[in-house]
Structures are given as C-alpha cells and as structure tokens.
C-alpha cells in the first residue's frame, strides 16, 4: 500500500513517467477467449528481459473483484488468476526470467498493519452480512403483510425464512489470502501447473526461466523480488543493461524500483483513475510507469544549486535521500508524521528542507541504506518550524470537506425521504423525525445497533443537519438530554458498543485489559474541545493553539502531563529506528523479523531533537511460521482458515490469549476525512506469550497440516529442451532431459542468460511439483478443464533454486557497462523543471551546470572529487553513447584515485587510515586485496584470456570490473579490490572456468571491515 496518493502526485508532477500499454485485442472462438498476441513475435511495447509478478496484486482482484460477482468457487478463482496472469505476460513478454512471488510470512513490523486490515475486513463483512439479513427479512415481512396469506403465523414464516438466510453460504473470506491457509497451498500448486502448461504449449516460453516463490518462502512478495534483483546485480557476470518490470498495484513499488539503481526499470499497473469510466465488465487498461524517466525528473528536481553547497551532486545518492524523505509521508510499517501528507505537498516541503540542509552538511543523509542521524535530526528540526502551519491547513481543509459532504448527504437523504413518502403514501412531520447524536444514540429512547451505526452513520449524522431548523432542534434536544442527566451524547462515532482499553505500548507487554475509555471522546460542555458537527470527530489536540504537543501525547498516547517530555523522545527514537529499519529493508533486506513500531501514532516533527547519538541496532531473529502469523493477524471470525486445534484459542473465553482477538475495537479518524483511513486501535501482540500457546498445539496437527506450516525455498521451472536445460547438461546436472545429479550446482548469470544461483534436485518430500507428469489440479466444469501431460510428453522440469547470498553490502550505484539512452525529456522540459525550482526557492543557479553543449565542463563540475568520477559510462548525467569517448581518455575525469574514492578520507562512517574506501581501514579496498573478487591473484576463475577479451584484461577491460583500478577505482570504492588488481576476470573468466584459479576465496590484504 505504501503512500496513498503517491502515484497521482508523481503522475501529475512528472507526466511523462506514465505511458500507455499497447495490448492486442483477444478474439472469441467457439466461446473461448483467444489471446490476440503472439508471444514469440516482437513486443510492440519494447523488449523486456525480466518480469516480476507480485502475485498478491493479481490474486486479490481475481478472488473478490470490485463491482463484480466473485467466482463461485476457489478453483474458478484460480482460473481467473490464470487468465489475468496470461494477459500480463502477453503484454510484457519477458525473454529471460519470470519471477512469480507470493507473500510469505512477513516481518513483525508488517504484521501489525496486516492485523489491522484483516480485523477491519472481518468486522465490515459481519456488518454487511447483518445488514443484508435484516433487509431481506424486512422485504419478506412486507411481502407477507401485503399478500394476506393464511395458515402459518407471520412469526413462524419469518423464523423459517431467517433460518434459510442464515444457512446460506457466506461470502468468501478474503483473509484466506494469508500464508498457511489451504487456499494458499492450492494457489501454489495451481501456479506450478500453469507454468508447466505454458512451457508445454507456448513456443515463446522455451528459453524462459520461471522462478516461483510461493507462500512457504518467508518474506513479502515485492521484497523477495528485491532480494532477487540485488542478488543478480552481485554476480560478476551480470549484464548491467538488463531490463526489468514489476507488475503490482502498491505505490511503494516506485520506491523499490528506484532503490534497485537499475535504470532500465518500469512498473506495470492498472490505470486506477480511468477504471471508473469503463462500462460494464470491460478490462481495466494497463499503463507503464517508467522508472528511467522518473530518474530524469528527479535529476532536475533534486539538483541543488545554492552557491554555498559544497557537496557534488550525485543522482544515485540524491535518489536514496528522496526515498528516505518519502518514508515520513507514508510506508507500510510506520504511521506517517501528522504534518506529512502527499496531498498537502509534504514531499516538496521536505525536499526544500533537504536542499537547504545540503548547504550546511558535509554529506548526503543516507549512504547505501544507512542514515546519518545528525543530519536527519537537523532536517526534521527545520521541518518542525512549519509543522503547525501545515497542521492548521489540514484542519481547515477537512472542515471544508465535511461541509461539502454534509450538503451532499442532506440532498441525498431528502431525495430518499421524498421517494419513501411517495411509496408509502404517508406524510412525516419534522417533529416526529427521530434524531441521533454522533454516537448513534437517540435523544429519546431509541438506541442504534452496531450495524445501523456503521452502515448509516453518514445518513444519520449528516441528514439531521439538512437545514438550519433541524440543526437547531438537534442542539436543543442534545442540551435537554444533558440537563436531565442522560449520558453525554456528543462522543465521536465508533465501531464498538463496549470499547476495550488501549494496551500498553510495550512490544512485550502483558495481555491487554479492558478499559471503558475511547480515543477522542468529546464533551460538549468542555470549551477546550472542538467537536465537528458533521462527523462528530472531537479535536482534543487543537493544533491551532499553543501547547498542542502536550495535548497530542496526553490524548493519543494517554500520557500524564509530567510524562510527556520523556515519552515524546522515546517515541521519536523508536520511530527513527523504524525509519532506519525500513531503509535497510529496501536496500539490504530484512534486518530483524521481530522488530516493530510499538505505537499507533507517529511523533511530531519537533520531537526528533535528540536522535543524533542514538544507537540503531537490531538483534538476530527468525521469521514466524505460517500458523504463527495466522494467529497473529487473523480475527476469530476467520479462524476457519486455521487447523481446528487453534480455533479455541481465538474464541473461547478461557483462552489465555483471548484478549488478542477482540470483536469490538476502536477506530480513530485522527483528523482524516474518510473512515477507511481511521487508525485501528488493536492490542499489540506479545510474541512470546502467543508463541508459547500456539506451539504447544503443534503435536496435535495432522501430517498435511504440518506440511502447510513448513518454510521452503524457491523453485525454478524450465523447458526440457531450452537453453537453460542445455547449460545444466553441460554442467552435469542433467543427461538427455533427465536430472541425474543430486549435488547442488552453482551457476552464474552469463552461462544461464540471466539467472545466477544454486540449483539442485528437490528433496523427495517436496518433489510433488517435479514429477515427470503434469496434472491439472482444479475441479471445474468440463469446458473449463485444462490438459494434463504424461511423463513422456511433459517438457516442464523443476529444480529447487536458491537465491545467491551477497558477500558484501549492496551499493547504491549504477553498474559498470550500463549504456544510457538519450534523454526522454527535452531541453525545454528540463529547463521548465529548473525554472520551477528557481521560482520555488528564489535562488540563483550556476548555468554551467545545465549546459547542453559543453558536456565536458558539466561533468567536471558535477564529478570532480566524487565517486561518480570512477563510474564513467555508468553515469546517467552523460551525453549519448556516441559522444562518450572523451570520458574514457580523460585522466582528470577518471578521478583522483588516491583520494577521491567513494566516501574516502573520513567521510560517512569511514576510517581515514590508509585510504581504504568505504568503511575500510587498509589499502585493500572493499573486501578484497590486490586480486579481484574474492581472489588473491587469479581472477574469477581462469588463467586465460579474460571474460572481456584480451589476455589479463578482466571482466570490463582495463584492470577490473570497473576498469581502471577496481569497482570504484583506485583506493576508493574498490581500493585495490572489488575488481582491482587483476579484476573480476583477473586472468580471465574466458580462459577456462576454474582453470588456474590461484586465489582461493579469501582475498588479499584488504579485508572486509564493517
């Protein structure tokens, strides 16, 4: 989900990042839909190497489509998944790798959000079901009354009718789309079949390698994709010009695409803003979101040109800082800062503060996923000076929104009332119209039910204010009710009738206890509380008045006045720790499976005033097992997705963990306009307490249930006669289309055309998907059945696949060998962006930085003394390839190899000793000595001519992976290492794999110093 509004914000600010998808129309033959595209034909959208499918983004709309009837069975839902996935594949047509990633167990930081969504979903479903039941009963009652039938009593007939409604099959529970459920097991089996079916029937798939990471593999789908991309970049034979595409709906995929630092990257998604204009069941159109063009916009928008700025502009690190700034506006793991909202222009405000900070700072805020906390503190300190102004503006905007909604609702209610009066032939006097307060309580003796409150809250609270007379009457009757000793009615609308107390903020607190209080309850007699008549939302904090910090923590965190100062710093430190966790998650993978932010609300920007010296450390931890996550995120109403042995723990009153499964819970609008944005105030789970009771039930599980609770690795499926299979035969894993070796085989990207990693025959217990025959696994009607394939005709083969583990920390840089295309933005468009920046800041710019003719002068200004100088061709800021020869032969632009490397000479977290580069202390550079990647002298594995040709030239020519003296050149980012000395190819990959490998796997003098 990420940042609501981010896609719209970027598509409006950077319009060229969005482009239409060319999609061939399908045809109907004998009632069957035939794709109009030929997968083997050239792709009209441009050729693509690797496609990554975040499968949850496909499964959800296929199982419970918006505005349409859901398929009647799970098996037919999976057929819809096949159909939709094929549509995506025919648009993208990847030629090398397809990765299908399903959400596995998530980090604890994400589980809290999943828990809130699933509890809210179950509650809404229950309310909807109750509303439907009552509506049908009411209709039946009217029918019987009008028919005047005799025989059974009206009460008896209605009881029988109600029982029939209760016994009707319920709506499919979308909470089944969670790891560990029978549905997810069925989904994985179905995808394995479908991939095998396509390999057997689609000629264009013959050389495609398909990696499936199902729900038994830990991690969120999009982050498993990120791990895969990082692992391939780390392979020494990786092609830096590989093109990538992710299909998915979440806005945070934009951040993930940027964080790869793979410029040939785009996203495929549905055009959600055009879908309402499509009639009936027409397919929603696809659009591309082009990350490479977004990088062009960011290059112009983020460039700092203040004359006091001494830091060289580096697009890659500027992008990382921009991603960091956006985390305060929203992400999947932390609540956004109160003053940060995309729709209010918060990203622009933060960027301006960042540019101002660059005049004071010595470096960027982030470095390869690590945060400079002192500079982060300085940034937020200056942002805090604008916080109150932004919050007041948000409040004014919300009030205007409420007024417009009130007018709209009043008109709609008046229309409904008029229609009802005509139908019933009755006249309703205003004096007899029941009036309700915002809690749903009648001023008289009528009390709304929970269902009526939630289902009709807008109609009730807004229609009562349809005209001034009604409003006056409401105020009078509310006051009269208060005077007679009735319970104070002017409390904000809430979803429960008997609210529970918010639990302790500690992540390992004791189980929560009940508390009759509720956030933001309002008292009309309190002059210090503002109550909005249209929604009943009580503004206790009142950001427009002084002292709002204390009120914020006292009302949102239930702190006492003398506790506020310590609490706000505690919350700020935990929040910043969370931001660091998220950044590391994006750039290096999950740093802790157990950490989570233990509060429902974010701190204020002014509270980050003592974070510069805080320690950010995460202890080792392991992911939950699937049933442990299910017990953490599912409400009791969805307990049918779990084995029967666990269900009493969720529903029985004497369960030791029953407090984790409340049926009623608080919703806090927290100043938001729409109810779906409300904060869901659920108790945080004590992991040790939960796991103690869940794991005690493991001995009662059946073998099938235990199997669903097992964690596994990815698999790769490929064609028996394709190029990948031929590579496996050359390496001895296969013979004549049959797997003959049980030993793991390590493969690099070059020999497999883009799929580095370790493959091996699956364990016997896990080999159901790799049997020679391929059987259609779904139970559907005959006309929907797909073919099965006997062993002698099945061309699909399956191996266990292990993603390579990086031996070094991922770096935020373009890889050597990348050839940038011509700019998409014209000179005029780039100038317009710069003019917009000048107008926003009112400052002067060095026009030399934007010269479109003197590229050499521009590069000298941007690159001198920075690690960009060592990347040469990989620079996005360079002219088209035909004009780049001047850089190769210019020793000045090659950089000061002794002193100018990547963060050398005491930069961010560095040690000055010995010119060692990023966090290195000796001369050896990044993890290596003089001998290249993990080698002392011999290179990647040969004694011959070198992967790049020419004896001793190494992988990239010159003397190593990055040319010159290493990955970054000289003593910097590579020191004499990561490509230095003899280079990634050293004596040469081409000289015979494994031949003359002299260096072993230890490296030389440098050593890995983190």
Curated annotation (Swiss-Prot):
Say yes or no: keyword rRNA processing present. Answer: yes
> GO molecular function terms here?
5'-3' RNA exonuclease activity; RNA binding; rRNA binding
Q: Composition bias, kind Polar residues: at what positions?
A: 504-530
The coding gene here is RAT1
**Family, per entry:** Belongs to the 5'-3' exonuclease family. XRN2/RAT1 subfamily.
Kindly list the organism's lineage.
Eukaryota, Fungi, Dikarya, Ascomycota, Saccharomycotina
Q: Which UniProt keywords apply?
A: Exonuclease, Hydrolase, mRNA processing, Nuclease, Nucleus, rRNA processing, Transcription, Transcription regulation, Transcription termination
Q: Name one GO cellular component term.
A: RNA polymerase II termination complex
> Please, one GO biological process term?
mRNA splicing, via spliceosome
The name on file for this protein is 5'-3' exoribonuclease 2
User: Known Pfam families for this protein?
Assistant: XRN_M, XRN_N
**Chain intervals with Basic residues compositional bias:** 998-1010
């Amino acid at each position: 989900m990420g940042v609501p509004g981010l896609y719209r914000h970027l598509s409006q600010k950077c319009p060229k990042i969005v482009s239409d998808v060319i999609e061939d129309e399908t045809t109907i033959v004998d009632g069957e839909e035939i794709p109009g595209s030929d997968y083997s034909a050239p792709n009209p959208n441009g050729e693509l190497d690797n496609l990554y499918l975040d499968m949850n983004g496909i499964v959800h709309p296929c199982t419970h489509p918006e505005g349409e009837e859901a398929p009647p069975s799970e098996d037919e839902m999976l057929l819809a998944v096949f159909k939709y996935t094929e549509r995506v594949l025919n648009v993208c047509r990847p030629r090398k790798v397809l990765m299908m990633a399903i959400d596995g167990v998530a980090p604890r930081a994400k589980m809290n959000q999943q828990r809130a969504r699933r509890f809210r979903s179950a509650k809404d479903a229950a309310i909807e079901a109750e509303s439907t039941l009552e509506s049908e009963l009411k209709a039946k009652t009217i029918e019987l009354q009008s028919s005047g039938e005799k025989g059974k009593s009206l009460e008896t007939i209605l009881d029988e009718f109600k029982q029939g409604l209760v016994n009707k099959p319920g709506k499919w529970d979308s909470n089944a789309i969670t790891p560990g459920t029978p549905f997810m097991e069925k989904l994985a089996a179905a995808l394995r079949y479908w991939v095998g079916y396509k390999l057997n029937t689609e000629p264009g798939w013959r050389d495609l390698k398909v990696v499936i990471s199902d729900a038994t593999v830990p991690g969120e789908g999009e982050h498993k994709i990120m791990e895969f991309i990082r692992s391939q970049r780390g392979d020494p034979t990786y092609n830096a010009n590989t093109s990538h595409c992710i299909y998915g709906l979440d806005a945070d995929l934009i951040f993930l695409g940027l964080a790869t630092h793979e410029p040939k990257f785009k996203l495929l998604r549905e055009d959600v803003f055009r879908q309402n204009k499509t009639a009936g069941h027409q397919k929603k159109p696809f659009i591309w979101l082009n990350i490479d063009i977004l990088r062009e916009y960011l290059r112009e928008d983020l460039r700092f040109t203040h004359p006091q700025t001494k830091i060289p502009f580096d697009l890659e690190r500027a992008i990382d800082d921009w991603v960091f700034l956006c985390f305060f506006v929203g992400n999947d793991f932390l609540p956004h800062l109160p003053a940060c909202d995309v729709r209010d222009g918060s990203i622009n405000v933060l960027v301006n503060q960042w540019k101002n900070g660059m005049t004071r700072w010595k470096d960027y805020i982030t470095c390869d996923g690590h945060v400079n906390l002192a500079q982060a503190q300085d940034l937020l300190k200056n942002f805090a000076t604008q916080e109150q102004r932004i919050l007041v503006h948000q409040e004014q905007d919300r009030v205007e929104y409420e007024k417009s909604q009130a007018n709209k609702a009043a008109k709609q209610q008046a229309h409904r009332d008029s229609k009802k009066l005509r139908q019933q032939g009755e006249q309703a006097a205003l004096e007899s119209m029941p009036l309700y307060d915002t809690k749903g309580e009648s001023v008289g003796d009528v009390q709304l039910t929970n269902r009526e409150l939630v289902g009709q809250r807008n109609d009730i609270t807004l229609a009562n204010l349809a005209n001034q007379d009604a409003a006056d009457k409401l105020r009078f009757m509310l006051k009269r009710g208060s005077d007679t000793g009735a319970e104070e009615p002017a409390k904000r609308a809430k979803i429960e009738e008997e609210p529970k107390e918010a639990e302790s903020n500690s992540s390992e607190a004791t189980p929560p206890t009940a508390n009759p209080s509720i956030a933001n309850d309002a008292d009309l007699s309190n002059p210090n509380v503002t109550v909005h008549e249209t929604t009943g939302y009580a503004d206790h904090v009142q950001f427009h008045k002084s002292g709002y910090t204390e009120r914020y923590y006292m009302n949102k965190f239930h702190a006492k006045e003398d506790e506020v100062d310590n609490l706000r710093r505690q919350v700020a430190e935990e929040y910043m720790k969370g931001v660091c966790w998220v950044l590391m998650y994006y750039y290096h993978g999950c740093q802790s499976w157990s950490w989570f932010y233990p509060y429902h609300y974010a701190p204020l920007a002014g509270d980050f005033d003592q974070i510069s010296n805080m320690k950010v450390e995460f202890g080792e931890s392991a992911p939950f097992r699937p049933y442990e996550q299910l017990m953490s995120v599912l409400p009791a109403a969805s307990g049918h997705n779990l084995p029967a042995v666990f269900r009493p723990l969720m529903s029985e009153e004497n369960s030791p963990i029953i407090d984790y499964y409340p049926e009623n819970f608080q919703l806090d609008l927290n100043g938001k306009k729409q109810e779906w944005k409300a904060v869901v105030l659920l108790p945080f789970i004590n992991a040790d307490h939960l796991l103690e009771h869940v794991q005690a039930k493991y001995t009662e599980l059946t073998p099938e249930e235990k199997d669903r609770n097992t964690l596994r690795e990815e698999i790769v499926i490929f064609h028996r006669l394709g190029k990948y299979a031929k590579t496996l035969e050359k390496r001895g894993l296969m013979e004549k289309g049959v797997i003959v070796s049980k030993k793991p085989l390590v493969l690099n990207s070059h020999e497999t055309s883009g799929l580095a990693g370790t493959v091996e025959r699956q364990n016997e217990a896990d080999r159901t998907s790799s049997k020679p025959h391929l059987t259609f696994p779904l139970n559907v009607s005959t006309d929907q059945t797909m073919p099965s394939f006997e062993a002698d005709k099945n061309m699909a083969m399956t191996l266990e696949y292990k993603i390579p583990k990086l031996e070094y920390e991922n770096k935020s840089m373009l890889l050597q060998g990348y050839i940038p295309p011509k700019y998409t933005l014209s000179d005029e468009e780039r100038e317009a962006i710069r003019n917009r920046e000048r107008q926003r800041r009112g400052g002067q710019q060095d026009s030399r930085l934007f010269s479109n003719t003197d590229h050499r002068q521009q590069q000298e200004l941007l690159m001198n003394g920075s690690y960009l100088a060592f990347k040469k061709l990989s620079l996005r800021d360079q002219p088209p390839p035909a004009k780049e020869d001047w850089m190769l032969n210019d020793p000045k632009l090659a950089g000061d190899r002794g002193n100018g490397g990547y963060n050398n000479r005491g930069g961010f977290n560095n040690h000055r000793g010995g010119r060692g580069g990023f966090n290195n202390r000796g001369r050896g550079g990044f993890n290596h000595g003089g001998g290249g990647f993990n080698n002392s002298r011999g290179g990647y594995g040969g004694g011959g001519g070198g992967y790049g040709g020419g004896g001793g030239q190494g992988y990239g020519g010159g003397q190593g992976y990055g040319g010159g003296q290493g990955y970054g050149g000289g003593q910097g980012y590579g020191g004499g290492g990561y490509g230095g000395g003899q280079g990634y190819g050293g004596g040469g990959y081409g000289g015979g794999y494994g031949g003359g490998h002299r260096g072993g796997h230890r490296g030389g003098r440098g050593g890995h110093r983190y």
